[in-house]
Every structure is written in C-alpha cells, then in structure tokens.
C-alpha cells in the first residue's frame, strides 16, 4: 500500500492511495476518516515527520572503495557508521536542491529510507522490521569538500533541503533485495541492490535502537551504493527503488531554489495555489 502525506486546501493530511484516489487517514498511523480526494488534486509532501534523521555511512563495500576509505587489508566495518542530518534538510519530491555558494563540490547519494511506525528501543534484528511503517526513496545531498575539510559533518550534510525524500511510503515491502538506481539527467549513475548492504536494514535498526530510542515518524537512511558523483545547477536527479517508485528533484542556485521545509505551511500553501493557477 502506498501511504502519502499531502497538502490539500483544507490542510496537511495522511492517506492511502488506491488507483487515483486517496483515502484520508486520521494520522500517520491512523484509520480512514471517511474522506477521499483525487491524487491529482493534492501536493505530495515528504512522507514522514521526523524528530531525528539517522544515516548510515559506508554501508556498501564498493562505495567505501570509491571514497578511498577501505581499511588496509580490506576488512569491512564491524559496526554501522552513523551520522545525523538535521530536520531542516527534509524536502519532498519535486522540490529544488539548493546549490549553496559556499561549496564547489555538491554530490548525490541515492538511498533507501525507512520511516519508523512505533517507538523502538533495544530491539533485536528479528524484531526490527515490525517497527517499520514503510520505505521510501531519499537523496543524501552532500557538500563533499566541506564534509572532508570540517571537523564535523554538519555543514557538509545538514544544509537546508539536503535530504529530499519521497514520493510516498510503500508499507508492504521486503527491503532485503531491492534495486536502487540513481539517474542524473536520465543517465544511470548508481545501480545497486540492497542485498549488497554490509549491514541489512533490520541489523541497522536494531543497532541504532541499542543506544537511541526511535519514535513514530523518525527517518533512517540506510546507505548509498557506489557511483556517487557531482551535481551541477540545472541537473535533474532521480532515485528509483524497486517496489517504491521515483523521487525526482532539480538542482538550482541557492538564491533561486524553491523548496518547503516539512512544517512550512505558508510556503506549502503558496505552492498549491501556484500549481492550480
């Protein structure tokens, strides 16, 4: 089932998509409230409302090699390497990716993302997927030069709109062997499978839960395959994940970029008005 978070003229809602219709829900984990609306009449928003965004770095061996970070001897990591992105990074499918003036090396990392359904703390890998609401596509946008030069990754990973997510959640999906592809201007740049992860989704979630409580709506990015590369102003980037669909965004000059923070109701409403003119 595809679950969407959307904007209509009476506010922001959650719903389930069946064909071209959305059945409105009482909340992210809610029940149908008797209202329906055509999918064509709404603006889709990022399908999550996280308090925290947790990311896995270097979860594909070939990506470690392409970054030149493979340890001497070729040993793979024994534990997931984690970092955080601020919730200010969250944007949706169709939003622009801003190219900041302070970086000369903006890069893409296409990823499978996980949205948490219920509070999870200290769970096993066998239990972990029971706490998942659904799966979606994401881009971990990275200012690679600042990631490498700064003491911490805050500037390199957490600028505004550096985490496009969408277009919806797929709630009935096995994440263990899915195709993950990233295209830039129609050319395939990344072509991997989740079965190539060093740490599968269930293990990642269980590991995080040992020391950090994840709550309903939180977002976990599970790592990127090899093939990451540079973005330029005007580029169209698409992340296609088997069983989910396609996340699509365009890179724009920072001063020209159009995007809405996930809780920016004024900007979201203006966008809906502009779409219907």
Which positions does each model-derived feature cover?
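Catalytic-pocket segment enriched in acidic/His residues
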Residues: 35-36, 43-47, 63, 144-277
